[in-house]
Amino acid sequence: MHNKNLDCTLYLVTDRDILKGRDLKKVLEEAILGGTTLVQLREKNVSSKEFYEIAKDIKVITDKYNIPLIINDRVDIALAVNAEGIHIGQKDLPANIVRKIIGEDKILGVSANTIEDALKAQRDGADYLGVGAIFPTNSKKDAESTSIETLKEIKNAVNIPIVAIGGINENNVQKLKETNIDGIAVISTILGKEDVKKACEELTGFFNE
């Protein structure tokens, strides 16, 4: 672990399908003004060229506000736009290999559902872990679920930041209070709202209460 002073409090994962035609850059800017501390660009059904162009565009916004940009899964895109980091799942390239490719200075996030996965990711050079799905989620139909109990156990087992993901909204975020996690990752709870800035402020408020 390389101390990168990561603020994972409110981690926004993008999904343009939820935006209903709204401009991603504009929505991101509102989210950042509302308290988003970390942005992950996730694009599943676009060409590499399109992903690159979107990432370049988004980087302008994240740079403006000094917010780290994390690219989902695509190490090549992350390097091409000089994003601050990359997030990988258990079925993507192994974390230790990704760490070698991106070097020591970039942020490496890894998804983990079990203590074994979490400890391995930490050994392999992860800077933070995404743990979930904690609650049922529409954005990832095949997401394995992780109990709040397991989330707590993972938090206690590792010494890198833990971000909970999966179905987190203003109605259930307080159930995560006693877990001592470092942040929450959300998609539709922010992107699906008319007032994105307010949605971020409310979530951050609940989480910090």
Swiss-Prot record:
Alphabetical list of CDD domains matching this protein: TMP_TenI
Positions annotated to bind 4-amino-2-methyl-5-(diphosphooxymethyl)pyrimidine: Q40, L41, R42, E43, K44, N72, S111, K140
Cofactor(s) demanded: Mg(2+)
Pfam families per UniProt: TMP-TENI
GO molecular function: magnesium ion binding; thiamine-phosphate diphosphorylase activity
Any one GO BP annotation for this protein: thiamine diphosphate biosynthetic process
Pathway: Cofactor biosynthesis; thiamine diphosphate biosynthesis; thiamine phosphate from 4-amino-2-methyl-5-diphosphomethylpyrimidine and 4-methyl-5-(2-phosphoethyl)-thiazole: step 1/1
Keywords: Magnesium, Metal-binding, Thiamine biosynthesis, Transferase
Cofactor note: Binds 1 Mg(2+) ion per subunit.
Record field: catalytic activity: 2-[(2R,5Z)-2-carboxy-4-methylthiazol-5(2H)-ylidene]ethyl phosphate + 4-amino-2-methyl-5-(diphosphooxymethyl)pyrimidine + 2 H(+) = thiamine phosphate + CO2 + diphosphate; 2-(2-carboxy-4-methylthiazol-5-yl)ethyl phosphate + 4-amino-2-methyl-5-(diphosphooxymethyl)pyrimidine + 2 H(+) = thiamine phosphate + CO2 + diphosphate; 4-methyl-5-(2-phosphooxyethyl)-thiazole + 4-amino-2-methyl-5-(diphosphooxymethyl)pyrimidine + H(+) = thiamine phosphate + diphosphate
GO cellular component: cytoplasm
Residues that hold 2-[(2R,5Z)-2-carboxy-4-methylthiazol-5(2H)-ylidene]ethyl phosphate according to the record: T137, N138, S139, G167, I187, S188
Enzyme class: transferase
E.C. code: 2.5.1.3
Residue numbers binding Mg(2+): D73, D92
Job of this protein: Condenses 4-methyl-5-(beta-hydroxyethyl)thiazole monophosphate (THZ-P) and 2-methyl-4-amino-5-hydroxymethyl pyrimidine pyrophosphate (HMP-PP) to form thiamine monophosphate (TMP).
Family, per entry: Belongs to the thiamine-phosphate synthase family.
Identification of the protein by name: Thiamine-phosphate synthase
Originating gene: thiE
